[in-house]
């Protein structure tokens, strides 16, 4: 919890991804280390920003080790970074 509000780089294996058109804002979730709801960290991409990616983020980052840069926030006791651009994410390796 000490890193909330800090601009940082977080890296980890993407355990599962999902694009939720049925939720307000059409979010894409990239969950690190463990699948939802046991993830240790989440990258959130809002639907309004998906067109900035050349490929669907939930497919691009699935089964990859990824680093994301941004401000760490807390949502329902889970840490996350909201990614607005592909420049915030780097694929480190395939799992």
Please name every model-derived segment.
Residues 1-95:
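OB-fold single-stranded nucleic acid-binding module
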């Amino acid at each position: 919890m000490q890193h909330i509000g800090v601009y940082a780089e977080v890296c980890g294996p993407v355990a599962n991804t999902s694009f939720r058109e049925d939720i307000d804002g059409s979010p894409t979730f990239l969950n690190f280390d463990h699948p939802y709801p046991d993830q240790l960290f989440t990258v959130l991409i809002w639907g309004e920003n998906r067109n900035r990616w050349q490929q669907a983020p939930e497919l691009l980052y699935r089964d990859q080790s990824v680093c994301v840069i941004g401000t760490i926030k807390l949502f329902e006791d889970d840490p996350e970074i909201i990614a607005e651009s592909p420049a915030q994410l780097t694929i480190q390796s395939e799992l």
